[in-house]
Amino acid sequence: MRYLLTNDDGIYARGLSALYSELSKDADCLIVAPEVERSAVGHAITLNRPLMVRRTKKDGNFLGYAVSGTPADCVKIGIKELSEKPVDLVVSGINIGANVGINVIYSGTVSAATEGAILGVPSMAISLGTLRNADYTFAAHFARTMARFIMKYFEKKSVALNINVPALPVQDIKGYAVTRQGKARLIESFDRRVDPRERLYYWLAGETQLSEQEEPDSDGSALSRGMISITPIYHDMTRYDALDGLKALLSKETSLLPVAKCDFQD
């Protein structure tokens, strides 16, 4: 069985190493990851330059392939070119910091899992809910458990799961919850600075905050209660409940471009 492992924190990230150590107990794992940190690049892919790929080593042994592109690039090239056998599962992580709510859109970690599902491979993204002093031990163990679960029920299916593990002692984790993506978002602030040559620059800062309208079945809410959140995600971004209303409103307008009416139905 072949697992493709990637992340957005870079090929030498501790979270990826912990993931490999645990998942390699069950499967032949191939690491294909960005050569440097590519956090918050979303689902970007590289079109304007070639992807450079190099074999990397750790302690004298082959570690994996470092790619000059994004996490989504890594999944594409890993599945299509670098794996000499079919990939059965894509696992992205372990990310340092939670990926919940609207911030999922920005996440390279989650986008890597989404890309795997687009390519027809079951996938999961796993993140740890802390930005400092991360202990990946339990998150890696849970990733192994979920990998077994996915291979049992979703083998060869285009499914993607976004998993967030609270950064708590194991005994304090209050179980898991199947959740939906919530409304938590980054509350932006900018750190304004001036360099030695008097040039102005900014660092994007801020922190993720739960929305006042956050429902108890959301990913961010579960994580805040000390639970593991497991969210099925999908790349179709259509808002289906708005289709009929939009059609009705547009049908009333006469000032739009003079094109033939079409309801896009067969």
UniProtKB/Swiss-Prot annotation:
Keywords: Cytoplasm, Hydrolase, Metal-binding, Nucleotide-binding. It is an enzyme of class 3 (hydrolase). It comes from the Bacteria. A divalent metal cation binds at D8, D9, S39, N95. GO terms for molecular function: 3'-nucleotidase activity; 5'-nucleotidase activity; exopolyphosphatase activity; metal ion binding; nucleotide binding. Binds 1 divalent metal cation per subunit. It is found in: Cytoplasm. Its EC number is 3.1.3.5. The keyword Cell inner membrane does not apply. It catalyses: a ribonucleoside 5'-phosphate + H2O = a ribonucleoside + phosphate. Its main location: cytoplasm. Belongs to the SurE nucleotidase family. Nucleotidase that shows phosphatase activity on nucleoside 5'-monophosphates. This is 5'-nucleotidase SurE. It comes from Syntrophus aciditrophicus (strain SB).
